[in-house]
């Protein structure tokens, strides 16, 4: 069960990175438009 836990942590990390990237892109677009 240890490998599954590590995989879950990796997936959660990727999701967090994806959300951070989307937020950064949104902020960049909003700043560029203004």
Swiss-Prot record:
Predominant location category: membrane
TM annotation in the entry: 9-29
This protein's record includes keyword NADP: no
Keywords per UniProt: Membrane, Photosynthesis, Photosystem I, Thylakoid, Transmembrane, Transmembrane helix
Listed GO biological process terms: photosynthesis
InterPro entries the UniProt entry points to: PSI_PsaM
Protein localization: Cellular thylakoid membrane
Topology in membrane: Single-pass membrane protein
Keyword Membrane: yes
A single Gene Ontology CC term: photosystem I
NCBIfam families registered for this protein in UniProt: PS_I_psaM
Record family assignment: Belongs to the PsaM family.
Protein name (Swiss-Prot/TrEMBL): Photosystem I reaction center subunit XII
Species for this entry: Prochlorococcus marinus subsp. pastoris (strain CCMP1986 / NIES-2087 / MED4)
Lineage of origin: Bacteria, Bacillati, Cyanobacteriota, Cyanophyceae, Synechococcales
Gene: psaM
């Amino acid at each position: 069960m240890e490998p599954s836990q590590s995989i879950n942590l990796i997936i959660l990390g990727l999701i967090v990175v994806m959300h951070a990237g989307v937020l950064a892109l949104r902020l960049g677009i909003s700043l560029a438009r203004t």
